[in-house]
């Protein structure tokens, strides 16, 4: 921890702006790496645990919706069976798992690091980003497994996979914006984490991740897409990984715009509240 604080202290030196940003990026990378190492330190399976957790959720939802509720779907180039439904389901769940995990942990990122908050030299803007990026890295293991099984099943790798970094930007903007907002408010309102848990449970079932969007009545479907960025993000993941073509350009554009606005608002609230963190904690 002393090494992290010393590295943060360098950011206060009279460095050119570009060097300050590089120093912050290097510090953020160090914090994310340490966070990932600390999560499963001492466990036998280590970093395989995130993948096992993701696969367990996949099996549960596949069994519930595909076998019990008999939800069926057909995708171009893939057989119409329960395994294809599992791939479709996993493609939608991956961004959701990264989103909710990162947001939930970011909520307590400030109140859980009082020693860093009270260090004058530490850039507090990095704290909510650490768990968000850690969850994003963890979800990448599941993403690689998904792409592997899609390639085996469809005998092809879609060129649209190259567009995944663009949808990651949308996803990170949304998660970071809400993470900044929740982290800042939690310092003053300790009920925020519990409230957020309830909101995320409702949000999950309002988002067509475990069921196709076509089952939503048409008069409500557009509202679900326009007002809920996670709907568009989940559909774009499926477009890029499973289908090989982007069918939701408009929804993607709206989701990116909304996510950027949420990021700006969340960061501004966090920045406004930041001077009082040390006094409250």
Question: Model-derived features: where do they sit?
Answer:
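Hydrophobic transmembrane alpha-helices and immediately adjacent juxtamembrane helices
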Residues: 1-281
């Amino acid at each position: 921890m002393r090494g992290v604080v010393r590295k943060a202290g360098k950011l206060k030196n009279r460095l050119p702006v570009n060097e300050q940003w590089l120093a912050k990026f290097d510090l953020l990378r160090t914090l994310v790496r340490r966070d990932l190492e600390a999560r499963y330190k001492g466990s036998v399976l280590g970093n395989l645990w995130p993948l096992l957790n993701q696969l367990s959720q996949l099996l549960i939802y596949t069994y519930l919706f595909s076998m019990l509720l008999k939800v069926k779907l057909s995708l171009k180039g893939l057989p119409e069976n329960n395994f294809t439904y599992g791939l479709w389901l996993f493609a939608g769940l991956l961004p959701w798992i990264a989103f909710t995990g990162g947001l939930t942990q970011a909520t307590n990122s400030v109140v859980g690091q009082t020693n860093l908050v009270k260090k004058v030299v530490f850039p507090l803007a990095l704290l909510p980003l650490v768990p968000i990026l850690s969850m994003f890295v963890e979800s990448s293991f599941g993403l690689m497994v998904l792409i592997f099984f899609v390639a085996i099943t469809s005998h092809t790798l879609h060129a649209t996979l190259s567009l995944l970094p663009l949808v990651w930007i949308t996803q990170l903007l949304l998660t970071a914006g809400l993470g900044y907002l929740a982290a800042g408010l939690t310092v003053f309102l300790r009920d925020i984490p519990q409230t957020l848990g309830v909101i995320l449970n409702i949000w999950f079932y309002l988002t067509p991740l475990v069921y196709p969007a076509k089952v939503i009545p048409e008069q409500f479907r557009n509202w679900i897409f326009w007002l809920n960025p996670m709907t568009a993000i989940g559909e774009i993941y499926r477009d890029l990984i499973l289908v090989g073509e982007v069918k939701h350009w408009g929804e993607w554009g709206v989701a990116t715009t909304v996510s950027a606005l949420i990021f700006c608002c969340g960061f501004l609230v966090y920045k406004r509240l930041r001077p009082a963190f040390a006094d409250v904690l």
